[in-house]
């Protein structure tokens, strides 16, 4: 089984940051990406388990994978239009 988190186009380490900083950093990073590129987000704020999926829905990005059973949490999103 392949790890979906390998070889993202960009990686964002948001460890040590607390809400709302991780989502603000994700938004800033995604703005600089091209449609279809992937972003690996690494975070340890429990609020990201709600905020990152919600951000993807609201901003119409695709959440390809998430790993939230252990810290640090990992999320992989693909930038939408």
UniProtKB/Swiss-Prot annotation:
One of its GO terms (molecular function) is sulfur carrier activity. It is found in: Cytoplasm. Gene3D superfamilies: TusA-like domain (3.30.110.40). Keywords: Cytoplasm, tRNA processing. Pathway: tRNA modification. The active site is at 19 (cysteine persulfide intermediate). GO terms for biological process: tRNA wobble position uridine thiolation. One of its GO terms (cellular component) is cytoplasm. InterPro entries: Sulphur_carrier_TusA, TusA-like, TusA-like_sf. SUPFAM superfamilies: SirA-like. It holds the Pfam family TusA. Sulfur carrier protein involved in sulfur trafficking in the cell. Part of a sulfur-relay system required for 2-thiolation during synthesis of 2-thiouridine of the modified wobble base 5-methylaminomethyl-2-thiouridine (mnm(5)s(2)U) in tRNA. Interacts with IscS and stimulates its cysteine desulfurase activity. Accepts an activated sulfur from IscS, which is then transferred to TusD, and thus determines the direction of sulfur flow from IscS to 2-thiouridine formation. Also appears to be involved in sulfur transfer for the biosynthesis of molybdopterin. NCBIfam families: PRK00299.1. Belongs to the sulfur carrier protein TusA family. Interacts with IscS. This is Sulfur carrier protein TusA. It comes from Pectobacterium atrosepticum (strain SCRI 1043 / ATCC BAA-672) (Erwinia carotovora subsp. atroseptica). The lineage of its organism: Bacteria, Pseudomonadati, Pseudomonadota, Gammaproteobacteria, Enterobacterales.
């Amino acid at each position: 089984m392949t790890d979906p988190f390998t070889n993202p186009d960009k990686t964002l380490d948001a460890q040590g940051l607390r809400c709302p900083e991780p989502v603000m950093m994700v938004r800033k990073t995604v703005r600089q990406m091209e449609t279809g590129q992937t972003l690996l987000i690494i975070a340890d704020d429990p609020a990201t388990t709600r905020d990152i999926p919600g951000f993807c829905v609201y901003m119409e990005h695709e959440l390809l994978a998430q790993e939230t059973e252990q810290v640090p949490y990992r999320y992989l999103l693909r930038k939408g239009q």
